[in-house]
């Protein structure tokens, strides 16, 4: 299916609030919101750490992550600041390690306590969508048979509480659902109208095509030619099997090839290599990365999807150690990148 560039001009654009400034030390939220608005984005993804940090400046102390009264106060104030700048709060993120805990486990009790609290935050922030990332809890701690039921139950709570939606994302370091096929299979089985996919260029290409633990930066479980063919077939399958209405958004970022290959082992916090890569090595497309970002975006567009393109980057520079970022210039660059990406999706080459 050929893409018509004219049909892409109405795609709405969002920028993740956590994605301006060094990942290790982001600047205050309000200047970031202003930079995002000045770059003509129309919405943000509201990141939970930004609620905590803005809450600290608002309240004079950092809110406890489970003090939902204070968190809702901060979220409501963020909504007010977004309203002043004509920014919608498109989604609250990232809700993690929710699904698959055994019955009566402390993990399950914690997950549901957080879920109820985050629903309150959604209401305060004025958003109708919650991003749920596929859990990276170690498999030996999970009951995989509960995954679908847990997400179905959460979807029903979201629907009852406010007509809210659940966008399920494959995190490429997830212990049980690292690929788009995995989350799509789960979403189909959940079978709720308010549950769809959060697809992501990094999570797809970074999981199926790239690998931060190899010298080449690519997966080496097959030969180079077979890798390209396998990835091409995966994207063709994505384009031909996922209904456009089940894609709630596409998140966009590239990745730097890491200076030296990561260990294949999890770090001291339990985070897997691709999770570490994700945290600090994700620039905008056309800015030093090497993933086939446009190939993924093109496949998503071929489903007929024309919804949110949301730029979620964690740009610590090629060495992951960047300390200073001109956030106004960076947001403007992201706006330019959006046009280049759409052009490449249609023509095979980015615009100048």
Report each predicted region and the residues it spans.
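Active-site acidic/histidine proton-transfer and metal-coordination neighborhood
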Residues: 2-3, 81-85, 89-94, 98-199, ...
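Acidic (Asp/Glu)-rich catalytic clusters
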Residues: 2-10, 31-40, 66-91, 114-126, ...
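Acidic/histidine-rich catalytic cores of soluble enzymes
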Residues: 6-11, 26, 43-44, 153-290
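Active-site beta-loop-alpha junctions enriched in small/polar residues
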Residues: 16-21, 47-51, 94-97, 135-137, ...
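A short, acidic, flexible beta-alpha connecting loop/helix-capping segment that sits on the rim
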Residues: 20-23, 310-329
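Aromatic/hydrophobic pocket-lining residues that form the small-molecule binding cavity
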Residues: 29, 71, 75, 108-115, ...
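Glycine-rich, proline-tolerant flexible connector loops at the mouths of alpha/beta enzymes
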Residues: 45-82, 134-139
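C-terminal helical cap(s) of enzyme catalytic domains, especially alpha/beta-barrels
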Residues: 321-350
